[in-house]
């Protein structure tokens, strides 16, 4: 690899990054810790690297020359191999002899075998931050290779609170009693509900087109090409069907039959692989049934889309699906961890509950409204039945706009509009 190309990239970023305009996100990184940031493409991982760099520059903890930032999606590095990664460090040392840089490696999963270089950096006492768009970077095998030298963090698209901050809206205390602030928040939520939290889309003149291009990049670049999928038609069909059915559990057999109905065929092992590829790319995330045996938990799952803006590409008048998907996204943000332990479930045994969080004793139903009697009886009655069977749980119904408190059979159910719930504390 030509060192001069690498030197040019290093200097370009040293000049550019300090001047980037950023919206501060509430992430704290330890001064002496190394991190791997993983999440869906364009979730804001690179911006968190920029934020860390700017924070250190502003504190006087480093100068621009201390920055070694490499984006491995730069086409000038397309031929770089794992055995050449040391050239990056060599190039920096030729520019700045005797300095030990802060190392930022963006989208390094593009380099097969990058783990050994990352481990060597950590062993040599470099402070390193890495980003990637594939969940396998958080897998057990990866941590075995890295030897516990990196702290994993999953990065999600902007929350509604972050979305408001981006648009310079600060609700303040008791905002729900201020009609003017409520009106402003409600208007911004209308956009967030349909367009999602992918930050780069916020300033795009045609947000839908931008999100469609992003979806195609994830589907083709991050999944089909990376995993050498031969029949992309089946893969596209499955992605569309999963988006269409975000509120419904889907078994492998059911999905296989759907594919068969189009005239194509797919084996169950291949189908399982396809679903894992989507999950690894953070396009979808699964939620198992709390009461299912372990084998069923792995197959009979609800699957939700990582961002409402992407989901909305598939829907026409899909407000109910968007509502439940947004609740799933927020619960996943609040209660997901980076181990293999599952914290978020749905419940289906004699009664259907949209979301359960055993660790927080939360049972949540999602309903666009409670206007008709049948909907009211189904949602409230289901929660009461669940609360009787599982003492200590707290019952919620999340709606589009309706708020009240329901007292029934000695139980209290909080009915909360989603835009208010999204701004509440994590409980």
Model-derived regions: residue spans:
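Hydrophobic anchor at the beta1->P-loop junction of P-loop NTPases
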Residues: 37
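Short glycine-rich substrate-engagement loop in P-loop NTPases that contacts/grips substrate
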Residues: 68-98
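Accessory nucleic acid-recognition modules appended to NTPase machines
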Residues: 66, 203-361
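Interdomain motor-coupling "hinge/lid" segment immediately C-terminal to the ATP-binding subdomain
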Residues: 2-5, 9-14, 141-249
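Conserved lysine of the Walker
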Residues: 45-46
């Amino acid at each position: 690899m030509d060192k001069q190309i690498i030197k040019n990239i290093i200097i370009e970023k040293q000049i550019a990054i300090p001047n980037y305009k950023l919206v501060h996100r509430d992430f704290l990184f330890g001064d002496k810790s190394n991190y791997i940031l993983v999440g869906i493409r364009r979730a804001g991982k690179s911006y968190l690297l920029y934020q860390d760099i700017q924070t250190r520059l502003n504190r006087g903890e480093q100068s621009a020359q201390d920055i070694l930032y490499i984006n491995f999606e730069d086409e000038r590095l397309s031929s770089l191999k794992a055995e050449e990664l040391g050239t990056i460090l060599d190039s920096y040392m030729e520019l700045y002899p005797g300095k030990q840089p802060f190392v930022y490696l963006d989208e390094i999963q593009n380099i097969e075998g990058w783990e050994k270089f990352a481990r060597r950096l950590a062993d040599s006492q470099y402070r390193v931050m890495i980003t990637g768009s594939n969940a396998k970077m958080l897998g057990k095998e990866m941590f075995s290779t890295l030897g516990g030298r990196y702290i994993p963090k999953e990065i999600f698209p902007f929350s509604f609170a972050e979305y408001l901050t981006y648009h310079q809206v600060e609700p303040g205390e008791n905002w729900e009693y201020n009609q003017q602030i409520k009106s402003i928040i409600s208007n911004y939520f209308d956009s967030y509900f349909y367009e999602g939290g992918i930050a780069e889309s916020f300033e795009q003149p045609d947000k839908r087109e931008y999100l469609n291009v992003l979806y195609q990049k994830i589907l083709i670049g991050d999944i089909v090409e990376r995993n050498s999928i031969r029949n992309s038609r089946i893969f596209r069909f499955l992605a569309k069907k999963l988006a269409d059915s975000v509120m419904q559990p889907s078994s492998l057999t059911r999905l296989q039959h759907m594919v068969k109905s189009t005239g194509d065929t797919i084996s169950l092992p291949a189908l399982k692989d396809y679903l894992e590829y989507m999950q690894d790319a953070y396009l979808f995330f699964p939620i198992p049934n709390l009461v299912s045996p372990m084998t069923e938990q792995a197959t009979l799952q609800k699957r939700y889309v990582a961002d409402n803006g992407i989901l909305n590409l598939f829907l026409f008048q899909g407000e109910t699906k968007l509502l439940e998907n947004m609740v799933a996204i927020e619960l996943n943000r609040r209660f997901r961890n980076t181990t293999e332990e599952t914290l978020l479930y749905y419940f289906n045994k004699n009664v259907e509950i949209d979301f359960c969080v055993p660790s927080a004793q939360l049972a949540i139903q999602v309903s666009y409204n409670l206007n008709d009697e049948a909907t009211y009886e189904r949602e409230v009655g289901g929660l009461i039945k669940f609360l009787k069977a599982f003492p200590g749980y707290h019952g919620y119904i999340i709606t589009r706009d309706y708020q009240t408190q329901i007292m029934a059979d000695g139980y209290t159910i909080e009915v909360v509009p989603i835009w208010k719930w999204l701004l509440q504390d994590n409980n």
